[in-house]
């Protein structure tokens, strides 16, 4: 990262793994014929039963010590070099779009010993797609709600003393407002109990983002506004709604994404910086690498400014 002048690693699990189980081929895997290193997940194996890929089932009550230690080591080494870890707590692609991700996911009922009550057999759409985000984000389910709470707290505990780690809710997140509210409430409870402060980035669709920022209590927990799942375009606004059980790519097929120029990127960052001057704003929306100077000039953070001059 240092050699290539990269400031941020935007990370979602898993880590350092053999990819044949989720390589997006349009076939179902009959068995667990895989090679190590295996797809490391945040949860430890239970030693009981057999998960879909042939190893023992996960225990959602037990963190995977190797996984969390590995990430913490990266954060600590990165801090020495001035690097940031954007820690995506979840990966929405596991529960929307490609079914290969869900079949091995720890939250799937067949893969854990914790009775998560997700549907079996897997409700594939067209024999390959998966749409279980609405169930996954349902915090009224008492069992899954508690496991979500424990997992979010593990994300916070692991990096409690790492100032270069930024917590985000999920990669590719287009989920509902109520789940973001729940996520922030857990963070707030953790901060109150521990006396520590997490650095939190609000990364969501525009309607969800605005609702949180207009919520006085929850907005206090947000340090960074991450513009990623919406953008201004030359002929208006591209802003899919949250909680529609559709991934970013699926929204993009149904709506006109449009063209983004310097003016639109500058407008988005500038508006939120002016409205919320106490918060940083990052911009990773449509065509963001080419919008680096617009982000920079609008007082945005972490722009991909293509400058090789070491004195800059």
Give, region by region, the residue ranges found by the protein language model.
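Extracellular glycoside hydrolase catalytic/binding regions
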Residues: 142-150, 159-312
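Active-site mouth of glycoside hydrolases
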Residues: 1-224
């Amino acid at each position: 990262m240092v050699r290539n002048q990269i400031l941020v690693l935007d990370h979602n699990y898993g880590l350092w793994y053999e990819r044949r189980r989720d390589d997006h081929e349009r076939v179902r895997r009959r068995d667990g014929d895989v090679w190590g290193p295996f797809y490391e997940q945040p949860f430890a194996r239970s030693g009981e039963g057999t998960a879909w890929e042939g190893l023992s089932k996960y225990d959602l009550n037990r963190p995977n010590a190797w996984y969390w230690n590995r990430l913490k080591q990266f954060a600590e080494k990165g801090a020495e070099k001035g690097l940031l870890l954007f820690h995506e707590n979840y990966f929405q692609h596991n529960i929307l779009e490609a079914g290969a991700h869900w079949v091995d996911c720890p939250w799937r009922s067949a893969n854990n010993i914790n009775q998560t009550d997700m549907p079996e057999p897997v409700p594939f759409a067209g024999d390959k797609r998966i749409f279980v985000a609405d169930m996954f984000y349902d915090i009224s389910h008492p069992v899954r709600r508690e496991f979500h709470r424990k997992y979010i707290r593990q994300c916070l505990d692991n990096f409690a003393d790492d100032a270069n780690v930024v917590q985000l809710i999920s990669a590719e997140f287009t989920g509902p407002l109520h789940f973001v509210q729940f996520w922030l409430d857990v963070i707030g409870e953790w901060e109150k109990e521990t006396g520590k402060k997490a650095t939190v980035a609000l990364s969501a669709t525009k309607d969800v983002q605005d609702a949180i920022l207009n919520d006085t209590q929850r907005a206090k927990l947000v340090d960074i506004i991450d513009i990623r799942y919406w953008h201004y375009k030359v002929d208006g606004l591209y802003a899919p709604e949250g909680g529609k059980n559709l991934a970013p790519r699926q929204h993009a097929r149904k709506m006109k994404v449009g063209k983004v120029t310097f003016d639109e990127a500058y407008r988005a960052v500038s508006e939120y910086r002016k409205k919320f001057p106490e918060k940083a704003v990052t911009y990773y929306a449509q065509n963001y690498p080419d919008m680096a100077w617009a982000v920079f000039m609008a007082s945005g953070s972490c722009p991909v400014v293509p400058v090789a001059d070491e004195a800059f």
